[in-house]
Design a protein with these regions (language model features):
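Conserved small-residue
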Residues: 253-305, 534, 731, 748-849, ...
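Short, small/polar-rich motifs associated with maturation and membrane association
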Residues: 1-362, 367-370, 374-382, 415, ...
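Switch/connector loops and helix/strand junctions flanking conserved nucleotide-binding motifs
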Residues: 131-132, 228-230, 248-249, 263-265, ...
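Extracellular/periplasmic, surface-exposed regions of secreted and cell-surface proteins
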Residues: 100, 146-151, 193, 199, ...
Length: 1003
């Protein structure tokens, strides 16, 4: 397109200028006759700000048709130029530059990009809007930023990219997912996941989306921007727009990388000698013989004598490869444009028999049927396979080091110690099991855009979004569990179908240059169906076909069949008004009717309003040259959470079986929960104040946000008198509050000829507090807490509740007169929190699990074709429970039956104050108090070094761009959490450290 327009400029009396996504055309000023005398030829090079030559740039004698375009190296040579002429240099996407014909600057012309931050166009839901006109709190993340993190989880790619968004890895195994919180937790039982909208289609998960298909991602954080999605938007909204076709010659992009994954940790397990000493001490403290022949039974004694200990961590965990390949083809003409994306992702697991693969294909088409009528489609299909090792991760690495993995003939041993302590070889069960799942997603979206008049348009949007998950497991005839049933297989399939149809009307009108008005009206119907089928069978002739032979099982369990649906009828009205390009107003009302609500509360109403003032456009700041942007934003509104389980308002029945002779009669009776016809949505009402600022032509820019959110009518299960015939009822009673501050700062400290240095910061602080649970109070009128769910009025929702570790009792302590008079030296000392000289349930304390604040620091350097970037992620505060320090399964109870984290435990000769005395027969009392650790951490998430080859060098190979890069991901972590990752319990699959080599090429 650029080359064509450049040629037209040279050969006609027209000029072209691009602003945002609009190309304007105009007629040149009246031509002047080129004087035949005193003319010359001017030569030079046209480059961008990075020194890259611009191919096809327009070089024109102003006011004439005498012009030329630059060659493949950005060079030009323009003849017949008069001494007093002005040379005009232009290229679409760059600011036009004018230079006198006698200037020395002609030798090298540098064009600046014509893309200020304020003119960025972002998606706001049911339309787009210039960044400068936005009144709500919206964060944007580019595709390049997302793809800087090597992961199959789009949520993990989003971590640290937007203030107000907290991402935690729920499962780092291949194909694992992440939890995303936007501005804190807002529901006790209705879910806290945001709503995802992909090309206008709602989705419950984005892990099936190929990140390379994404053009932009927006996070809607305040009620004014969220309210257009009504009863589903209380936890925030993430809008994803995928790449579309473009007019002009075909563009082919290929992106690939290969990566090596490995574990990292900040703790050590006991080695063989240390574990043997621990076991002896545990026997001694249990008043058992700690002679070697008594302590080390079975194979343990042989290994102890030989010193050939097993390092289970090294045996079970190894480096693993990960690769990704993406192809994107974009093209189009005057009528039809298309984008075709194909992707393949493959991640091997670091433990045996685990891995994840995904194939994806996306096709987006836009076709102009008539001058004012466009149709299009978005098509997505993904298929993924996930393989999971049998057993939990902690069972792999906490086997005793005094063990034998293999028999003398090289075959696997089943019991690695033969000590009678159920030390089953983890490799054994992996060999005799098969656990796989397959996920298929199909999304088809059709739309029609009709430009009825200059100001009025209509869009019809219909979509089908289906997802099918097949989950299969098999425990073979030799598996330690499966052998009890001569093999056991399970097979389950879940189906979800999401149907959406929308009618959208837009009206846009400019009343002279000072008044801009636009209105959007929408009506939609959304139906979601979910089905789940499950079956299990036992008794197999052999293990050859694993779960595929479930049809030939000898016995079957009771099949399961579940189904549910949701229906949503919605209406939306939104009005935006721009006065003098300085005063911006937005008003919206969404109405949702949901099938899951009670019959007395079928419809929810969610209004919002917002105002923004572009202060820098005021006359009193027009001359403030250092100030490039200053905008104040205010918003207030309500959004909902329809987290009601389908049919909950109607009441559920329980199945009962009755025997009549040789027949079984199935019947149904009302369940234990009373129906509630008043059941409705949870409502979050939120106010937001934001300040956008920019200095030095955008070299310093950022945003400060403060919000205050009150969520009412939270769903809780309330106990009711049994005299009613029921025990519980789900009601809208609880209340919660969130408030916080968010800061985003982007700076360019250095910007010179060939060198650029950028630094960016984000800061997020959220305070969450439960204000009310079920309305019940004690005899003093104090609200009652829900200890079972760990919900406490006046505290955050996500907490631990336990005793406080205060050291280890020593021989010289006056134990008899203490608050724990029955304790013994070497046992755990608890803190007497209320100072009543005894340990009771009242000494337990509430510990916040979520961080107090999170932040990022990023920097990037660009020198000619080289670039270097780094991102630091900080999570401060919060608590994590570490079972490696407390439980038997994780070797933390100091009974010396399994291996665990090396501890400085108490002995007669080592009166430690860190961990109690080991005991073979009894775990230390109150040992759970040892498991709570400060969850703060600092992590170097990504370091990337890359090189972009000069266009002049690669253009001969028909390349537009070529980039090679290396990335170190999760390379360094500083934390006190003794685990493989500061956000995971040690039994979870570890988050890997990754070394990556990648290539991006465009033709």
């Amino acid at each position: 397109l650029e080359n064509i327009l450049s040629m037209i400029t040279v050969q006609t009396n027209l000029y072209f200028n691009k602003k945002n996504n609009t190309i304007s055309v105009g007629k040149q000023k009246s031509q002047e006759t080129i004087k035949s005398t005193r003319t010359k030829t001017v030569n030079g090079t046209v480059t961008d700000q990075n020194g890259e030559p611009i191919i096809g740039a327009n070089v024109l004698v102003k006011g004439t048709t005498n012009g030329i375009i630059t060659d493949i190296n950005g060079n030009y040579s323009l003849a017949n130029v008069t001494e007093d002429a002005t040379i005009q240099f232009s290229y679409i996407g760059y600011q036009t530059t004018e230079v006198k014909a006698n200037s020395k600057e002609l030798a090298r012309i540098i064009l600046k990009e014509d893309s200020e931050l304020l003119d960025e166009v972002i998606v706001v839901g049911y339309g787009v809007q210039k960044r400068s006109d936005v009144t709500g709190a919206i964060s944007s993340v580019t595709s390049e930023k997302l793809n800087s993190t090597p992961s199959s989880s789009l949520g993990e790619m989003l971590r640290g990219q937007a203030a107000g968004v907290q991402v935690t890895m729920s499962n780092a195994a291949p194909g694992g997912s992440s939890n995303i919180l936007i501005r804190g937790r807002r529901s006790l039982s209705g879910g806290n996941d945001p709503l995802y909208i992909v090309d206008g289609v709602p989705m419950t998960s984005i892990d099936d989306i190929n990140s390379n298909d994404i053009a932009s991602l927006e996070v809607l954080k305040d009620a004014s921007s969220q309210s257009i999605y009504g009863a589903r938007a209380a936890n925030g909204v993430i809008l994803i727009t995928t790449k579309r076709g473009q007019t002009g010659k075909m563009k082919i992009s290929y992106n690939t990388y290969a990566a090596s994954q490995s574990i990292h940790k900040n703790f050590e397990f006991y080695n063989g000698e240390e574990w043997a000493a621990l076991r002896k001490e545990a026997y001694y403290n249990a008043n058992l013989s700690y002679d070697e022949t008594d302590c080390f039974r079975g194979l343990m004694l042989d290994v102890f004598k030989s010193g050939e200990y097993v390092d289970w961590e090294k045996l079970m965990i190894s480096s693993a490869w990960q690769q990704k390949h993406d192809i994107l083809i974009q093209s189009g003409g005057d009528k039809t444009k298309y984008a075709l994306g194909l992707g393949y992702f493959d991640q091997n697991g670091m433990v045996p028999n685990s891995g994840f693969q995904r194939l994806s294909g996306r096709l987006n088409i836009d076709h102009k049927l008539l001058k004012n009528l466009t149709i299009g489609t978005n098509f997505l299909y993904t298929k993924s396979w996930k393989k999971t090792a049998d057993g939990s991760f902690n069972s792999f690495i906490t086997m005793p080091p005094l063990a034998k993995v293999y028999n003398d003939d090289g075959s696997l041993r089943e019991d690695v110690t033969e000590a009678g302590e159920s030390h089953y070889n983890p490799l054994w069960n992996i060999d005799y099991s098969n656990n796989k799942s397959q996920t298929d997603r199909l999304l088809i979206n059709f739309f029609v855009d009709w430009k009825i008049t200059k100001d009025l348009s209509y869009r019809a949007n219909g979509s089908l979004n289906t997802r099918t998950v097949h989950s299969n497991t098999y425990q073979g005839t030799k598996h330690t569990t499966g052998r009890n049933n001569n093999g056991k297989a399970t097979a389950g399939t879940s189906f979800s179908n999401d149907y959406l149809f929308e009618n959208i009307v837009n009206y846009v009108k400019d009343f002279n240059k000072n008044h801009h008005f636009d209105a959007t009206f929408m009506q939609s119907v959304n139906v979601i169906e979910w089905k789940n089928l499950g079956i299990n069978g036992t008794g197999f002739a052999n293990d050859d076909l694993t779960y595929n032979a479930i049809g030939s099982a000898n016995e079957y369990g009771t099949p399961t069949w579940e189904l549910s649906d949701r229906k949503l009828l919605s209406f939306l009205g939104r009005v935006r008004y721009n006065l003098f390009e300085k005063y911006l107003f937005t008003f919206a009302l969404r109405v949702d009717g949901s099938s899951v609500f009670g019959k007395n509360n079928k419809y929810g109403y969610f209004p919002s309003g917002a105002f923004a003032w572009r202060i820098n456009e005021e006359s009193f700041l027009k001359e403030a040259k250092l100030l490039s942007n200053l905008k104040l934003r205010l918003s207030y509104g309500a959004v909902g959470n329809q987290g009601v389980t389908p049919y909950k308002s109607l009441g559920l029945t329980d199945r009962y079986l009755t025997e009549f002779g040789d027949k079984t009669i199935i019947g149904y009776l009302p369940g234990t929960e009373l129906t509630n016809p008043n059941l409705k949505w949870e409502t979050s009402t939120s106010g937001n104040i934001g300040l956008d600022f920019g200095f030095f032509n955008g070299r310093i820019n950022g945003t400060i946000e403060y919000y205050n959110t009150k969520t009412t009518d939270l769903l809780v299960t309330k106990s009711i008198p049994s005299s009613l015939g029921y025990s519980t009822q789900t009601v809208n009673l609880a209340e919660m509050k969130n408030n916080g501050i968010e800061i985003t700062l982007n700076t360019t400290p250095v910007k010179i000829k060939d060198f650029r240095w950028n630094v960016n910061f984000t800061f997020t602080k959220n305070k969450n507090e439960i204000k009310k649970i079920d309305g019940q109070v004690d005899e003093n009128g104090k609200p009652l807490d829900d200890v079972n769910n760990k919900w406490f009025v006046g505290y955050p929702m996500n907490v631990y509740y336990d005793y406080v570790f205060d050291g280890i009792w020593q021989k010289d302590d006056d134990i008899a007169n203490s608050h724990m008079p029955t304790a013994t030296p070497g046992s755990i000392k608890l803190r007497d929190v209320n100072n009543d000289n005894q340990i009771t349930a009242d000494d337990r304390v509430v510990m916040q699990r979520d961080p107090k604040w999170i932040g990022t620091v990023g920097t990037s350097f660009n020198y000619k074709g080289f670039d270097l970037s780094a991102d630091l992620y900080i999570s401060h505060g919060g608590t994590i429970y570490n079972p490696y320090l407390t439980t038997f399964e994780n070797g933390g109870d100091l009974t010396a039956k399994r291996n665990g984290i090396r501890r400085n435990y108490w002995t007669q000769n080592n009166p430690s104050n860190e961990a109690p005395a080991p005991n073979m027969t009894q775990a230390p009392a109150y040992i759970s108090s040892l498991g709570y650790q400060d969850a703060s951490y600092v992590r170097l998430r990504n370091v990337t070094f890359g090189y972009n080859f000069p266009r002049a060098l690669i253009s001969k190979a028909y390349m537009q761009s070529l980039r090679l890069y290396m990335t170190l991901s999760n390379f360094w972590t500083k934390t006190d959490v003794q685990a493989y990752g500061p956000e995971q319990t040690p039994g979870d699959y570890p988050e890997p450290r990754t070394v990556l080599f990648g290539l991006n090429v465009t033709f």
